[in-house]
């Protein structure tokens, strides 16, 4: 089926452990990149996400799981980890996105730690497309 890269592809990559042939999988991801798709690693920091992804998968975006953001203000180890990941991502040309931002304090800390982008309820709850367009795109019209 034809899918335009601008429309996204959803969750192509869920769990490295579910992939039987890593080489074939990596080649498939490279082919998607040739067609203009961006490859994202979602929920990094939980489940099967590991640092080995940086050496085995050529991806564009690393999305930090909200569990790392939730305790950011009180947890120095979480701040050190995110700051270190920001450096690694920057050096590798990977965009770092923090999920689950709910407070201005979290936002300020993530800016200081050099996180590229943030998302979360601080800005908006998930919206149906029509509601999003009505709320955010009217100013562009």
Residues covered by each model-derived region:
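Single conserved hydrophobic/aromatic residue that forms the stacking wall/gate
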Residues: 1-13
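EAL-family c-di-GMP phosphodiesterase catalytic domain
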Residues: 14-23, 35-141
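Conserved functional hotspot residues or short segments at active or partner-binding sites
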Residues: 28
């Amino acid at each position: 089926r034809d899918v335009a890269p601008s429309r996204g592809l959803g969750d192509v990559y869920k769990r490295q452990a579910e992939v039987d042939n890593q080489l074939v999988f990596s080649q498939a991801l490279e082919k998607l990149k040739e067609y203009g798709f961006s490859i994202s690693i979602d929920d990094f920091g939980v489940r099967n996400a590991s640092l080995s992804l940086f050496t085995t998968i050529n991806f564009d975006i690393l999305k930090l799981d909200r569990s790392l953001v939730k305790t950011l203000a009180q947890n120095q180890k979480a701040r050190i980890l995110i700051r270190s990941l920001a450096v690694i991502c920057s050096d590798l040309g990977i965009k770092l996105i923090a999920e689950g931002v709910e407070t201005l304090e979290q936002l300020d800390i993530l800016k200081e730690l050099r996180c590229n982008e943030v998302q979360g309820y601080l800005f908006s709850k998930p919206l149906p497309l029509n509601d999003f367009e009505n709320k955010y795109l009217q100013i562009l019209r």
